[in-house]
Amino acid sequence: MTRAQRSLKDIIRHFTPNWFTMNMGTGILFLSLHESYPSALPGQDVLTRGLWLFDMVLYLIFTALLLSRFVLFPDTLGRLLRHPVQSMFLGAIPMGLVPILDGWLLFGGQIFGHAAVVLAETLWWTDAFLAVLFGWLVPYFMFTQQEHLLERMTAVWLLPIVSAEVTAAAGGLLARHLPPGVAEVIVTTSYVLWALSVPLALTIVVILFLRLVLHKLPHRDMAVSSWLVLGPLGTGSLGLLLLGVAAPAAFAGTQLASLGSLAYGVGVIGGLMLWGYGLWWWVMAWVLTLRYMREGLPFNMGWWGFTFPLGVYAAATLQLAHETGFVAFGVFGALLVVQLAGFWTVVTARTFHGMWHGYLFNAPCLSNESGGLHPRGNA
């Protein structure tokens, strides 16, 4: 066996779900660019479509690598599930798929017509299944087999929980493209998915606040986790807004018809309140990050936490601008997208550097074995 073949085998064995956070960050970037600057920038349409295609290719590659790991090294699945940090990133698998299916709704119809909507609906149900599966599976292992201490807790606990509300937000967008009967099922299911995620995520945020007060900041390797709280708050807000927009048409002519206008109002008010909660965490995340930067931030795949949570918060801000007509939301949302693009550019460059040199392919759940490509890598 050649050196290159051994290297590929090592990469497969040490491939982790963390890599799907790259899909999350890239996906929310093209969605945010499409929403905040619709055809306003030279080459904007080509850029967003290009990022969508790039995101799909990455997702297919990452899926093939992860499945290859579990087929070739089946013992690593159990070790992953028992790892108190790596297992959390299983939630990134369905979350990374959501922007891709949204892209089929935004761009695919111009090429494939109604078939693009059918594919997006199929992907949505697949995504919903995975989100619910990991939303129960990972906490089960947390309760029964993983070892956790309050002082070691970080916001990564949110990852397997938040995926269901990300799917719910996508359901609000998908429902607009479907006939009323199907749209009603999608919207109703999405509200259930939202409820499976947001209340539990808010509970975790409360525990996280207590942990930070009692035990102060986590190690700088987990510094970026302070941005993750924006995820459930931004997506929770966005989900209420999008479902509120979709509900009147989806419920028309059904027993729930009278709830359509109510759902819209709840979406705006509830979305605004969650957005305000997120504003507190956005400021705090900046303050904590600047403090960490004085110590130096070591790069790892956790840096993708700079992107998706910020992106969904930006998307919620832009949706609030659309629903309320307040110019301030539009301006702030556009600035958040600029921040997102800057973060994405830096993190992508560092990621490709780590991929080329191999040090990012290092599974912590296998850290007691020899054969890791580099001591650095995944957080």
Q: How would you describe each model-predicted region?
A:
Residues 39-42, 177-187, 247-261, 292-296, ...:
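Extracellular/periplasmic helix-loop-helix junctions in multi-pass membrane proteins
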Residues 274-275, 330-346:
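Small-residue-rich transmembrane alpha-helices that serve as helix-helix interface/gating elements
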Residues 259-324:
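Extended, compositionally biased non-globular segments
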Residues 3-35, 48, 52, 74-102, ...:
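Juxtamembrane helix-loop boundaries in multi-pass membrane proteins
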